[in-house]
């Protein structure tokens, strides 16, 4: 139990430290999403603490991911008129983006001759962690592996997303939000809020819709592949 408590506080401290570093040196390789797990893995290996012992405390943070999504209700309420006005455009774009993410991931994985379990673990990588892990378990994947790919997708999305926005000169706040929320879930939403509160809110909606659509569409689409 003591190790679990230490693990919990250590995880929070490492994350806060990584966040401070990222604020001062905002680079891809200083992202807390990358630095925090790398430091924690290094520390666990150094002191020879098994993952099971760490997860007694660290796992509590994973359990908090689901209720944490409730916080997105605040901007949703604030910008409800905007959401209502562009509901059809948002839903259609997120639906297309989610299906493309599922199909392209599965096809590339099959082309690389990856095992079925790994393919099923990769497919839900584009949605927020709690739902991605649930979808992975539902279709026969490995939730822990899925969580890793979710983080990698978030990192790539927060780097490539703004580049796409700049290159194609996407000035529309709705389009920016849909792009980042659908492709990079929570991390993309955080980046969208840096652009504007409207983009962040649309990104929140897109992230939630993408999660629901992936939950429903992934088992169906994979049955044809």
From Swiss-Prot:
The keyword Protein biosynthesis does not apply. It is a multi-pass membrane protein. The chain crosses the membrane at residues 1-21, 31-51, 56-76, 88-108, 145-165, 205-225. Keywords: Cell membrane, Membrane, Transmembrane, Transmembrane helix. Its main location: membrane. It comes from the Bacteria. Pfam families: LrgB. One of its GO terms (cellular component) is plasma membrane. It is found in: Cell membrane. Belongs to the YohK (E.coli)/YwbG (IPA-22R) (B.subtilis) family. NCBIfam families: CidB/LrgB family autolysis modulator. PANTHER family: MUREIN HYDROLASE EXPORT REGULATOR, PUTATIVE SEROTONIN TRANSPORTER. This is Uncharacterized protein YwbG. It comes from Bacillus subtilis (strain 168).
């Amino acid at each position: 139990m003591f190790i679990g408590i230490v693990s919990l506080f250590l995880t929070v401290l490492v994350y806060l430290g990584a966040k401070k570093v990222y604020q001062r040196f905002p680079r891809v390789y200083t992202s807390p999403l990358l630095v925090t797990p790398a430091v924690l893995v290094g520390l666990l290996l150094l002191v020879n603490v098994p993952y099971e012992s760490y997860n007694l405390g660290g796992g509590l943070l994973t359990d908090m991911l689901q209720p944490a999504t409730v916080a997105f209700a605040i901007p949703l309420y604030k910008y409800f008129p905007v959401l209502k006005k562009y509901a059809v455009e948002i839903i259609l774009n997120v639906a297309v983006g989610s299906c493309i993410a599922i199909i392209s991931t599965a096809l590339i994985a099959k082309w690389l001759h990856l095992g079925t379990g790994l393919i099923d673990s990769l497919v839900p990588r584009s949605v927020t962690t709690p739902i991605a892990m649930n979808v992975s378990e539902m279709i026969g994947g490995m939730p822990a592996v899925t969580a890793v790919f979710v983080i990698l997708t978030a990192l790539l999305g927060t780097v490539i997303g703004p580049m796409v926005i700049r290159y194609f000169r996407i000035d529309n706040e709705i389009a920016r939000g849909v792009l980042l929320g659908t492709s990079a879930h929570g991390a993309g939403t955080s980046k969208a809020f840096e652009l504007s509160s409207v983009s962040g809110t649309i990104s929140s909606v897109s992230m939630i819709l993408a999660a629901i659509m992936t939950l429903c569409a992934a088992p169906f689409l994979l049955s044809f592949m």
